[in-house]
Amino acid sequence: MIAFTLLLSFLVALVAAKPTTCTKGAHVIVARGSLEPQGPGAMGELAEKVLKLVPGSDIESLVYPALYNEYLESQPVGVRTLTSVIQAYVKNCPKTQLVLMGYSQGAHVIMDTICGASSTGFPATLPQPSFVTDKISSVILLGDPSLTEGQTFHVGTSVGSGMFPRNLPAGCDSIAKKTVSVCDKGDPFCEAGGKDLSVHLGYIPVWGDYVVKESVRLAKAFIKKAKAC
């Protein structure tokens, strides 16, 4: 616990020290999966493709522990950090769109931040206000443990819910039309009872082109709408 507290203090200092630079394209925030080193992780490959296809964009890697054994402590830290990051960015850069991309625990962090945390075992939080969600052009998720059966933005072959389904899935309604949450059958995290870890680790080559295309489509639609206003 002492080591975790020291790590948390270090991460908070890193976040606080980072200046804000507004972009004309999209500000892409990437939340890595469990046990990946600090940075964008596997999702970074897809984020870089979005940057190339949406001119004037930049990328930010969410600074949070991404621990596995301490998941119940690590994930809420990510939620608190991402909440601070996106609210500060929207206030400082109100004309810039946000693209959120998360893998595994990172996907869970993003959805709890935006939808409000309502899964059993995690501290409850409220959904983000409209001044934040209105600036989000797309949310791209791979292997989200909080995926809940019936959510319209699910794509893939999985059945049922993830390990940590939402008790209040309606909190995601504000971003449902701009979210893509990929989960395939056998993934032990986004499909509770799944037993094939290779499915969870294999989304980039299978779904990468699709989610990049969707993110870019939504980003360009956001820019077009902003210019029309």
Identify the role of each PLM range.
Residues 6, 71, 128:
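Generic anion/oxyanion-binding catalytic loop in active/binding sites
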Residues 20-97, 182-212, 219:
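Active-site catalytic motif of lipid deacylating hydrolases and related acyltransferases
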Residues 151-229:
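C-terminal catalytic-base region of ester-bond hydrolases, centering on the histidine
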